[in-house]
Amino acid sequence: AFDESKDSLKFLKKKYPFVNCLKRIDGILKFDLIFLSGVIHHIDKNIRKKILKKIYMSLKLTGRLIIFEHNPYNPLTNIVVKNCEFDKDAQLIKKKDLIKICENISFKVDDSAYVFFFPSSMKKFNVLEKYLEWFFLGAQYFCIFKKNESLNKIN
């Protein structure tokens, strides 16, 4: 696990002592999978590309990057983020903007969708989510990225 927040890593290590916590991501270690859930909106807009480049360099050629983020198009998500103490400095990012940044780094989108359309009190409607993944009002979205195969053949 890696987190810029040393406090988060201390908490993780205390609760799950078997987890290997990394002090930095520098591209030396290579991973099959890197998973970010609700992280990008905490990274300042001005350094997102730099951080995502480090992540790109830390993936194996066949590796995947999976990102889940809050959807700024969803009005309820905006209310939750606005009232969350952890999100005081949050800068939500649209799915298309995240994809654009990642494609500029040489990631290729493997899959993406909007998710979480219904609150838990309406879970019987969750079966409809697979038909709504294109609709921009899900509470969150995910993107699965891989390294651009045409560039991998060159490297």
How would you label these PLM feature ranges?
Residues 1-27:
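Class I SAM-dependent methyltransferase SAM/SAH-binding core
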Residues 35:
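A conserved beta-strand element that flanks and buttresses the S-adenosyl-L-methionine
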Residues 43, 81-97:
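Acceptor-substrate binding/catalytic loop of class I
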Residues 49-61:
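A short glycine-rich, Lys/Arg-flanked "PGG" loop and its adjoining helix->strand segment in the class I
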Residues 62-70:
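Conserved beta-strand signature within the Rossmann-like core of class I S-adenosyl-L-methionine
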Residues 64, 110-155:
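A C-terminal cap/extension of S-adenosyl-L-methionine-dependent methyltransferases
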Residues 69-75, 116-117:
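Short "lid" loop at the C-terminus of a central beta-strand within the Rossmann-like core
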Residues 90-106, 111-112:
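Short alpha-helix
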